[in-house]
Amino acid sequence: GPILCLFSWFCYLFIKTGKFSYMFFVILVILFISTLLLLQPDIGTLMLYLSSFFLLIILYLRNIKLFFILGFFGVSLLAFAYFTFDHVNLRIDNFFSSESSPQVARSLSAIIGGGFFGVGLGEGQLKYSIPESHNDFIFAILIEEFGILFGLFIALLYPIFFFLIKQILKSQPNLFIQNTTFSLCFILCIQAFINIGSSIDLIPPTGMTLPFISYGGSSMLSYAIIFGTLINFSKNEKNSFSNTS
């Protein structure tokens, strides 16, 4: 959240002043975050952050050619990760193979077993058979215990949240707040899509948590910071940034 806001601020200053020094800081932030995440390595989070950074650059510069250039860069990075990191290679190969990975197979079985109304709170078995199930496969656990209808309700909360943010942005004249709010909302919604998609075998598992639902102190803190920033932007449409817009 804070890093994305800082990145957006440097982009905003570059657009307003035209000084290349601000673009230098933009590139520096990208390289710094990319290096830290590659050293872990956490390719899923790296792709999430880079897509958010690229989205901000496109929103500020509004250049369709840049969209294709950054898209090509993203695909190249994914190809690099596939041929460099064994765990990325394994997850992608398992996804495109005829059989699902054991974890995803158990997740799908739990979803089917839950039916429309679930087996009841605490009665699900998936959480006992998959490591870190409270993070990566929390969505499947919810469906198993509370049912498909409850899972659909949870899944719909994120696009509804995105729609509400778009409504707020309609009355926001400041470019910095517009783009930063949109990108923060993008992170939350895309991360939710990735988590849910991996639980139902739409995309390869990445280990990403489900915003505001998965267990985890650091991830919950980051969501709280993002949500607090969004609330602050929505309540202060005419703040100090408006003087520079």
Give the location of each predicted region:
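Hydrophobic core segments of transmembrane alpha-helices in multi-pass, intramembrane catalytic enzymes
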Residues: 1-11, 29, 45-56, 73, ...
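Membrane-interface transmembrane helices that cradle and orient dolichyl/undecaprenyl
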Residues: 7-21
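Hydrophobic alpha-helical segments of polytopic membrane proteins
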Residues: 18-39, 43-83
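Interfacial segments of multi-pass membrane proteins
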Residues: 51-66, 126-150, 207-224
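Hydrophobic, glycine- and aromatic-enriched re-entrant/interface helices and adjoining loop segments
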Residues: 66-152, 176
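Hydrophobic alpha-helical transmembrane segments
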Residues: 145-165
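Loop-to-helix entry and N-terminal half of a specific, functionally important transmembrane alpha helix
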Residues: 168-207, 213
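A juxtamembrane structural motif centered on a specific transmembrane helix
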Residues: 195-245
